[in-house]
C-alpha cells in the first residue's frame, strides 16, 4: 500500500509560561491552531522490517529524524502479524527551527499513517503517549483539533478559535527551542488563567521579546508585518505571522513584501488537514484510531 499524507504546520496564537518542572521542562498555556499548509509524507508499507527514509535531509542525521524515530517506535509497539516495514518519502516545506511544528507534525503523521497501514490497532491515546515520548508538541497533532495545550503540551482542551488567514514570514535563521527557554530573562511565572480569561485577553507570546532581541532578523520581519496587521511570533520562532480576516487582504499585503522576506499564505483551521483527509476518504479519525 502506498499513501500520501499531509503533515500540517501549526501556529501558537498565544504562548505563556506558568512554571518550570524540576526536570527543566516548562509548563505552558498555549493556543495551537493548524494551517492548511505543511509537509507531505508518502509511505509504502513493506514486509522486510526495514524503515527507510528515501530522501533524507542533509541537515539531520537519519537516526535523529523524527519520522524514522516515530516509525521505529510504532514498529516496536505494533502487534501486527508478520514483518512490517516502510519506505518513506518526506517533502519538506516547513523550515527547521521556525516554530511551525514541522518535525512534530511529521512524526504525528507517521504514527497515524503507519498505525493504519500496518493495522496496529492502537487508539489515539496510545499514539499520543508514543508521540509524547518523542516530543511535547506531537500529541496535539495526533489529536488533530485546535486546542489549549497545558502542562508541557500534553494536556489538551479542544477549542474553536476564529479561522483567520495568515501571512507567515520565515526569517532565515534556525532557532532551537532550548536556546530561548533557557534564557535567564524569560518570564516563567505567569499566573495560570482560565480558558475564558485566556480568550478575553489580547493574545501574546511571552517568548517574543527574548527571541527578537536575540535575533534582530526576526524583529525586522515582525516589525514589517506589524505595519499592516496584528502580528506575533509562533513558538520560540523564528517564524512570525500577521492575521487577516480574508484571503484577499492577506494576498494584498504579501504583494508588498520586500525581496528579502520569504513568506507564504495559509488559512488557520481547527481540524487538522490530516484528519480532514481521513474524513473525506470516509475513514473517520475516531474509527481509525479508537478500538
Swiss-Prot record:
As its record notes, the protein acts as a catalyst of:
4-CDP-2-C-methyl-D-erythritol + ATP = 4-CDP-2-C-methyl-D-erythritol 2-phosphate + ADP + H(+)
Documented EC number(s): 2.7.1.148
Pathway, according to UniProt?
Isoprenoid biosynthesis; isopentenyl diphosphate biosynthesis via DXP pathway; isopentenyl diphosphate from 1-deoxy-D-xylulose 5-phosphate: step 3/6
SUPFAM superfamilies with a match to the protein in the record? GHMP Kinase, C-terminal domain, Ribosomal protein S5 domain 2-like
Enzyme class, top EC level, equals transferase
Chain residues that bind ATP: 95-105
Q: Which UniProt keywords apply?
A: ATP-binding, Isoprene biosynthesis, Kinase, Nucleotide-binding, Transferase
Q: Which InterPro entries match?
A: GHMP_kinase_C_sf, GHMP_kinase_N_dom, IspE, Ribosomal_Su5_D2-typ_SF, Ribsml_uS5_D2-typ_fold_subgr
For molecular function, the Gene Ontology terms on record are:
4-(cytidine 5'-diphospho)-2-C-methyl-D-erythritol kinase activity; ATP binding
Please indicate if the UniProt record lists Protein transport as a keyword.
Answer: no
Q: Write out the GO biological process terms.
A: isopentenyl diphosphate biosynthetic process, methylerythritol 4-phosphate pathway; terpenoid biosynthetic process
Quote the catalytic residue positions.
Answer: 10, 137
NCBIfam families the record matches: ispE
Q: Which family does it belong to?
A: Belongs to the GHMP kinase family. IspE subfamily.
Q: What does this protein do?
A: Catalyzes the phosphorylation of the position 2 hydroxy group of 4-diphosphocytidyl-2C-methyl-D-erythritol.
Please give the HAMAP family that the UniProt record associates with this protein: IspE
Query: Can you say what this protein is called?
Result: 4-diphosphocytidyl-2-C-methyl-D-erythritol kinase
Q: Which organism is it from?
A: Baumannia cicadellinicola subsp. Homalodisca coagulata
- Per UniProt, what is the name of the gene that codes for the protein in this document? ispE
Amino acid at each position: 500500500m502506498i499513501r500520501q499524507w499531509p503533515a500540517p504546520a501549526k501556529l501558537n496564537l498565544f504562548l505563556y509560561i506558568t512554571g518550570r518542572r524540576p526536570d527543566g521542562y516548562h509548563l505552558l498555556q498555549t493556543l495551537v491552531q493548524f494551517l492548511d499548509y505543511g509537509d507531505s509524507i508518502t509511505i509504502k508499507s513493506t514486509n522486510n522490517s526495514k524503515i527507510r527514509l528515501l530522501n533524507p535531509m542533509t541537515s539531520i542525521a537519519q537516526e535523529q529524524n523524527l519520522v524514522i524515530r516515530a516509525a521505529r517506535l510504532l514498529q516496536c509497539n505494533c502487534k501486527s502479524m508478520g514483518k512490517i516495514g516502510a519506505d518513506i518519502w518526506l517533502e519538506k516545506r516547513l523550515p527547521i527551527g521556525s516554530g511551525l511544528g514541522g518535525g512534530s507534525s511529521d512524526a504525528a503523521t507517521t504514527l497515524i499513517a503507519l498505525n493504519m497501514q500496518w493495522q496496529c490497532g492502537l487508539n489515539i491515546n496510545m499514539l499520543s503517549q508514543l508521540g509524547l515520548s518523542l516530543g511535547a508538541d506531537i500529541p496535539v497533532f495526533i489529536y488533530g483539533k485546535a486546542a489549549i495545550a497545558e502542562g508541557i503540551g500534553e494536556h489538551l482542551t479542544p477549542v474553536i478559535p476564529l479561522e483567520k488567514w495568515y501571512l507567515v514570514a520565515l526569517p532565515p535563521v534556525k532557532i532551537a527551542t532550548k536556546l530561548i527557554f533557557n534564557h535567564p530573562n524569560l518570564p516563567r511565572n505567569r499566573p495560570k488563567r482560565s480558558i475564558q480569561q485566556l480568550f478575553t485577553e489580547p493574545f501574546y507570546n511571552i517568548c517574543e521579546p527574548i527571541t527578537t532581541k536575540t535575533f534582530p532578523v526576526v524583529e525586522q520581519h515582525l516589525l514589517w508585518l506589524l505595519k499592516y496587521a496584528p502580528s506575533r511570533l509562533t513558538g520560540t520562532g523564528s517564524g512570525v505571522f500577521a492575521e487577516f480576516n480574508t484571503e484577499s487582504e492577506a494576498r494584498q499585503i504579501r504583494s508588498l513584501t520586500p525581496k528579502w522576506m520569504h513568506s507564504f499564505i495559509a488559512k488557520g483551521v481547527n481540524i487538522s488537514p490530516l484528519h480532514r483527509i481521513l474524513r473525506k476518504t470516509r475513514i473517520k479519525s475516531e474509527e481509525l484510531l479508537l478500538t
